[in-house]
Amino acid sequence: MKRAFVTGGSGFVGGALIEALRGRGVEVVALARSDDAAAKVTALGATVARGDLDSVDVEDLRGCDVVFHSAALTKEHGTLAEHRKVNVEGTRAIVEAAQRAGVPRFVHVSTEAVLADGHPILRADENVPYPARPAGPYPISKGEAERLVLAANRAGFATVIIRPRFIWGAGDTSVLPQIVEMVKRGRFAWIGGGHHLTSTCNVSNVVEGALLAAERGAAGEIYFLTDGAPVEFRAFLTKLLATRGVTARERTVPKWVARLVAATTAWMRTPPVTKTAIALVGHEVTVVDDKARAQLGYASRVSIDEGLARMQTPSVSS
């Protein structure tokens, strides 16, 4: 791999990908739709391609060996139309641009959320079918995006999908900051006590899996990625919050109450809880990454303890 194109490069996963690629000496072209995004990817060593997913210049993709598509609308609320615009139509646009540019490989960063329908997910593998009724706009749109990417796979254009579960780690600009803010405002509660199991995937392990998918992933295949053995959600999140110097209150909300609140406040622009959030963190969600380990040589090299240590700020660790 000599040249790669990255979407979502100013975000959590995309930024980590750029950093890893540049560390390997790979030339990186990163899509940026704003001055702020352009500044971020430039600081990471990427060449800026100005535009949005639906307006990318095909010339910026020419000569690239692979596209890493990590850009997505990941919020738990919002309309289906909003999510489809970015996650489905945006994916369609970048896939078509990559095909026109003659890029031979396309790695799509997806999520275990494509299987979320409100029921626990127990040690799911890549053979589990998409649910009939996904739990909200985000799972719906990401599932549709996956189908689109798989359908685009053909001779000369190999598409590979990775599904990391609960991405976390140093540099998180999305999930953890939101949870920290909820805790600080007294709006956080453990759904059902939080003592269920969860799979997790440190951002460094996501990057490891993405790079391996680009190098060794079988065309038209999906690979789950995790940190290894599942952990108790409450214990893990407590440690994660501690890296920010924050402790969650003991308050617990029964799952049926959370579901009722989600149903009655779904009309709000920013509801206190959503059915998507409940589906993803309100009960067990565990997946197995045996396929990635066997076929890609994936090893989740960063342990949870090491990942937490990397997140410690001087003020917290002193």
Show which residues each predicted segment covers:
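Conserved Rossmann-fold NAD(P)-dependent oxidoreductase catalytic core, especially the SDR/UDP-sugar
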Residues: 89, 93-137
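Amphipathic terminal alpha-helices
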Residues: 290-294, 299-318
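NAD(P)H-binding glycine-rich loop region in Rossmannoid oxidoreductase-like domains
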Residues: 37-42, 46-93, 97, 117
